[in-house]
């Protein structure tokens, strides 16, 4: 995941903030054209900060799971340890 492919937006219904992808994916028709341009923006900084904060908050749990060689590390961390992967409250990506 490239953080600078996302920007922070407000959900028009719930007013909650969420990260929305604005960059095309490799399989999209416009991808080759899009890659010809360089975009620099600080718009991804809130996502980077959010990810770093999650990692810092759950650092001990992350190391514990890695040490145990958990088979489904991502699922366990997301669902069991942090409870961050509940039902989505934001709009799906286009």
From Swiss-Prot:
Source species, domain of life: Eukaryota
Family: Belongs to the canopy family.
Protein name from the UniProt record: Protein canopy homolog 1
Gene that this sequence comes from: Cnpy1
């Amino acid at each position: 995941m490239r953080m600078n492919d996302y920007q922070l937006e407000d959900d028009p219904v719930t007013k909650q903030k969420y990260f929305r992808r604005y960059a095309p994916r490799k399989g999209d028709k416009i991808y080759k054209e899009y890659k010809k341009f360089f975009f620099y923006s600080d718009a991804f900084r809130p996502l980077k900060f959010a990810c770093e904060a999650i990692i810092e908050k759950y650092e001990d749990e992350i190391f514990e799971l890695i040490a145990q060689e958990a088979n489904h590390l991502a699922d366990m961390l997301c669902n069991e340890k942090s409870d961050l992967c509940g039902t989505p409250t934001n709009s799906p990506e286009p």
